[in-house]
């Protein structure tokens, strides 16, 4: 078989429009090494059911800089593994953006051409991605009954009706529609949503209760029909439930079955976890898995294993068990709860939030949700009511611990569906990740090829197995490769030393842990912040650890500082990354455009600046790079998984923006006290921890938040260099950053010598949050020397370039 270096030769790459990148070759080589590695020695462990053989997959970690061709390298390694062994491979991602890139941007065809080998590849998506023909017909009947005539909607309906049994399943998804149009149709000014039109989903919005105390919530009424109205429309169409199910699931079932037959399956992290839990029933016999966007794998697992409750789904379950419909009023209340949860998600950037924090930060929404929950009733389904009772109690007690559970609002990792969660115990993500790559078989069981377990090493002493790990059947993975642009822990001295433990990988199972960064790839310059701007939030005490996202007033001086940066040199295109939609709303308000609390708004273009608001999905916002009238995009959604590239006149592709502005570091909010105390107890109860003090546990949690922040910052900076010809200027405008001492001293002296009105004043004895202290560690090594020659953006709005400083300053 041809070696990797020969595959990535210039002669092979040039016809594909690709350039040779040594780092891409190295990534593919590392992945192949991991996939070829022998299984680690098995261990004999003692469980409650007797002695068993515990076997982990051969695993490896690969970190590579953004834009270096990780995805094509992974596909090449997967194709070669399929041909070499006959085994099937899964490639798992977190974002749908990367799945679309693999599917639509030619990565699969390029990988096939490089290897010279043909394989069957399927992209496996969930049923919520498929359009329900019966729901489309039901809405169409309802709109016709109400006299609604909309050309865009008619075009959408005609497209759905044009499907035939020979239509490819993926051509019946929302992704296929968005290949032609940016959004779903609007009817009477309201945008239809995917969860309203997808198979197996109920509408998430509906009429508010007739006695809703807040009469201003007019958006709860009108467009979206109640389930009863949909049922009436279905009856008019004479569509029986069995026929409806068969009609809706036809393409999805073909899609799912085809994926089981293919050599390589592209899917997402949650599906991989469900595949393991189902004993391989979802994807079939998969022997190897490559996790792309690995840094988001823990988030997907954490969300998947939380106990989630959605009111309208609870009513559906009750209807099935009782055999009759629930009262229409309860349907209305459930729909109103869903709308309220969606609005809360927009306020909190779809992060988990407890009732106590909600009451503090958004009291009107807390009161509204508490009233709706109090009115929500589910009769005749007692087995499903314990979680609902805990939720109601938590709101009555303002978020204190209720029974044995912690109640909070959460949002699904991919589709961002809201749910009320009851979590009785901390989700042990590391343990759950270990389950994906661990198998247990009885010692005296007859070994079979399907077991995928190597013979136990007789020299290994018996150990006590983790009973929780043992509970989950092995999915069949013999090899697991983890790849990402942000695997490392930027705070540790050896950034890769302990990363494998975060993913439940034993040291003995670790084949390779490598980092790759090209010596030359693009160019990057920097602009650093003015610490005299103070902090983004006015409450200094609560913001001391970098939190501040929720419930704290914004600092108008900081907002104006960011506005000046956006307006500086308007001829240069800018991508402005900020952690929260609240930031976007506040920046828009400084322009004189205010939005009412809870208002779901579409993005606004003002003076050439696009303000991304929750009403538009991120992939739709990204398409605005093709518009000549957009000079800047402000968004919290494009930190990762996005390639904002445009074609040059010479045919090469470069990033759209010339400036990338980081408004503030994306620091996760500190958890509520009740959740933090629970996490501390879990850390102290871990028998593997040698240090068991509360201070140690709190410090560990603080470092974990800082690591999450820096990993996301690394991804955000990576948006700026996607190819060898890209040249980007990075603005780091968080005034809490700890500035390099030598650079700051040089700038201070230069400004003083020029008798400038601008000054650089460093705070004295400031206690820095770890992410604000160690941010330089995420700058690519090849660009770190540029930090000492950074420009300085003063509070006045003047940009002092390094040439300005050195020409007139002390170096002159």
Report the location of each language-model feature.
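Signature of the SF2 helicase/ATPase Hel1-core->accessory helical subdomain module
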Residues: 74, 80, 97-100, 104, ...
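A substrate-engagement module of RecA-like helicase motors
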Residues: 2-14, 19-22, 40-56, 66, ...
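Conserved RecA-like P-loop NTPase helicase motor core
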Residues: 532-544, 614-738
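Conserved interdomain hinge at the start of the Helicase C-terminal
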Residues: 532-579
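N-terminal targeting/trafficking signals and adjacent low-complexity tails
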Residues: 675, 686-693, 732, 736-812
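Conserved RecA-like ASCE P-loop NTPase motor core of nucleic-acid helicases/translocases
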Residues: 88-96, 481-485, 572-584
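A contiguous, basic/glycine-rich beta-loop/short-helix subdomain that forms a polymer-engagement track
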Residues: 201, 205-206, 227-260, 273, ...
């Amino acid at each position: 078989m041809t070696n990797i270096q020969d595959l990535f030769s210039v002669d092979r790459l040039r016809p594909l429009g690709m350039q040779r990148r040594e780092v891409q070759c190295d990534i593919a080589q590392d992945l192949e090494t991991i996939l070829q590695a022998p299984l680690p020695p098995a261990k004999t462990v003692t469980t409650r059911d007797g002695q068993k053989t515990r076997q982990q997959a051969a695993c490896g970690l690969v970190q590579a800089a953004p834009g270096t061709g990780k995805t094509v390298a992974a596909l090449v390694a997967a194709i070669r593994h399929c041909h070499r062994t006959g085994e099937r491979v899964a490639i798992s991602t977190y974002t749908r953006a990367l799945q679309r890139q693999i599917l639509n941007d030619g990565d699969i065809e390029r990988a096939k051409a490089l290897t010279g080998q043909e394989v069957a590849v399927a992209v496996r998506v969930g049923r919520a991605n498929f359009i329900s023909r019966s729901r489309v017909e039901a809405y169409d009947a309802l709109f016709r009954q109400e006299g609604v005539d909309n050309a865009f909607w008619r075009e959408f309906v005609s497209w759905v009706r044009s499907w035939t049994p020979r239509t490819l399943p993926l051509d019946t998804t929302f992704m296929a529609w968005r290949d032609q149009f940016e959004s779903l149709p609007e009817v009477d000014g309201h945008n239809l949503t995917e969860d309203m039109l997808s198979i197996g989903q109920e509408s998430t919005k509906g009429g508010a209760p007739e006695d809703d105390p807040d009469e201003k919530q007019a958006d709860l009424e009108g467009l979206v029909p109640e389930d009863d109205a949909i049922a009436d429309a279905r009856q008019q169409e004479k569509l029986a439930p069995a026929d409806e199910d068969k009609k809706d699931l036809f393409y999805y079932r073909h899609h799912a079955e085809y994926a089981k037959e293919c050599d390589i399956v592209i899917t997402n992290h949650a599906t991989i976890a469900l595949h393991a839990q189902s004993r391989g029933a979802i994807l079939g016999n998969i022997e190897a898995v490559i996790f792309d966007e690995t840094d988001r794998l823990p988030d997907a697992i954490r969300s998947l294993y939380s106990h989630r409750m959605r009111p309208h789904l609870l009513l559906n379950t009750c209807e099935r068990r009782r055999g009759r419909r629930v009262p229409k009023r309860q349907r209305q209340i459930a729909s109103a709860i869903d709308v309220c949860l969606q609005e809360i998600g927009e306020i909190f950037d779809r992060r988990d939030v407890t009732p106590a924090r909600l009451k503090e930060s958004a009291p009107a929404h807390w009161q509204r949700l508490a009233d709706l929950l109090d009115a929500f009733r589910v009769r005749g389904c007692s087995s499903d009511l314990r979680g609902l009772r805990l939720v109601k109690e938590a709101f009555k007690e303002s978020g204190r611990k209720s029974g044995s559970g912690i109640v909070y609002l959460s949002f699904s990792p991919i589709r961002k569906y809201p749910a009320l969660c009851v979590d009785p115990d901390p989700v042990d993500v590391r343990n759950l990740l270990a389950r994906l790559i661990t198998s247990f078989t009885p010692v005296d069981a007859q070994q079979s090829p399907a077991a995928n377990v190597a013979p136990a090493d007789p020299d290994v002493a018996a150990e006590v197995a983790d009973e929780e790990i043992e509970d989950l059947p092995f999915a069949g993975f013999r090899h697991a490769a983890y790849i990402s642009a942000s695997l490392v822990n930027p705070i540790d001295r050896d950034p890769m030393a302990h990363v494998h433990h975060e993913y439940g990988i034993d040291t003995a199972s670790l084949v390779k842990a490598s980092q790759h960064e090209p010596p030359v790839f693009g160019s990057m310059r920097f602009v650093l912040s003015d610490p005299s701007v103070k902090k983004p939030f006015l409450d200094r005490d609560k913001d001391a650890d970098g939190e501040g996202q929720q419930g704290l007033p914004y600092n108008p001086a900081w907002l104006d500082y960011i506005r000046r940066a956006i307006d500086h040199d308007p001829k240069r295109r800018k991508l402005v990354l900020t952690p929260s939609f609240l930031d976007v709303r506040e920046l828009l308000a400084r322009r004189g455009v205010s939005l009412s609390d809870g208002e779901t708004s579409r993005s606004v273009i003002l003076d050439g600046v696009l303000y991304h608001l929750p009403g538009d999905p991120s992939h739709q916002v990204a398409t605005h790079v093709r518009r000549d009238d957009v000079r800047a995009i402000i968004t919290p959604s494009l930190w990762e998984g996005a390639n904002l590239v445009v074609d040059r006149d010479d045919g090469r592709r470069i990033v759209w923006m010339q400036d990338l502005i980081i408004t503030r570091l994306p620091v996760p909010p500190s958890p509520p006290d009740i959740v933090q105390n629970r996490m501390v107890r879990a850390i102290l109860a871990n028998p593997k921890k040698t240090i068991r003090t509360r201070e140690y546990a709190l410090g560990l949690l603080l470092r974990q938040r800082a690591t999450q922040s820096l990993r996301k910052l690394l991804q955000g900076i990576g948006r700026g260099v996607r190819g060898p010809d890209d040249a980007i200027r990075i603005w780091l405008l968080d005034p809490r950053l700890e500035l390099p001492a030598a650079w700051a001293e040089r700038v201070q002296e230069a400004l003083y010598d020029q008798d400038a009105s601008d000054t650089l004043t460093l705070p004295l004895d400031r206690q820095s949050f770890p992410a604000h202290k160690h941010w330089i560690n995420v700058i690519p090594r090849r660009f770190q020397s540029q930090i000492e020659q950074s420009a300085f953006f003063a509070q006045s709005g003047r940009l002092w370039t390094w040439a300005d400083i050195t020409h007139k300053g002390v170096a002159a």
